[in-house]
UniProtKB/Swiss-Prot annotation:
It catalyses: (2S)-4-acetamido-2-aminobutanoate = L-ectoine + H2O. PANTHER family: L-ECTOINE SYNTHASE, PTHR39289. It is an enzyme of class 4 (lyase). This is L-ectoine synthase. Gene3D superfamilies: Jelly Rolls. The lineage of its organism: Bacteria, Bacillati, Actinomycetota, Actinomycetes, Mycobacteriales. Catalyzes the circularization of gamma-N-acetyl-alpha,gamma-diaminobutyric acid (ADABA) to ectoine (1,4,5,6-tetrahydro-2-methyl-4-pyrimidine carboxylic acid), which is an excellent osmoprotectant. Pathway: Amine and polyamine biosynthesis; ectoine biosynthesis; L-ectoine from L-aspartate 4-semialdehyde: step 3/3. The gene is ectC.
Length: 132
């Protein structure tokens, strides 16, 4: 059994802030935990514009706090998000998140991230294998 709190991972190597300061991700479960997925609490700043493309991962996101827009860049669709909204990027969609207010979300990645990934110029995380 693994038990962790966000308080104990705050300001550790599991607490990642984007280079532009727009988002912060507390990576609660990572690939090294060997459970087949990773689990993060991510906060995105109000008024920011954030483009992502998880070409190597499926991501499920549940919005706990905040409001904003999710723009599906592959299908030209815009979704209004609020507390209780969920979106699943099961088609590796390129997308943009535009928070109207600060957004706090819980995210699950499969395959799991290791915690060392950095978005490249296209917003993509590389696929990093976790040793068995």
């Amino acid at each position: 059994m693994i038990v962790r709190t966000t308080a104990e991972i705050t300001d550790t190597e599991r607490d990642i802030t984007s280079e532009d300061g727009n988002w912060r991700s507390k990576r609660i479960i990572l690939g090294g935990d060997k459970v087949g997925f990773s689990f993060h609490e991510t906060t995105i700043k109000a008024g920011s514009v954030n483009e992502f493309h998880y070409a190597n991962h499926v991501e499920a996101v549940w919005l706990v706090e905040g409001t904003g827009k999710l723009i599906d860049l592959d299908n030209d669709k815009v979704y209004e998000l609020g507390p209780g909204s969920m979106y699943l990027l099961n088609g590796h969609e390129r997308h943009r998140v535009e928070p109207e207010t600060e957004m706090r979300m819980l995210c699950v990645f499969n395959p799991p991230v290791t915690g060392r990934e950095v978005h490249d110029e296209n917003g993509v995380y590389p696929l990093i294998e976790v040793p068995a």
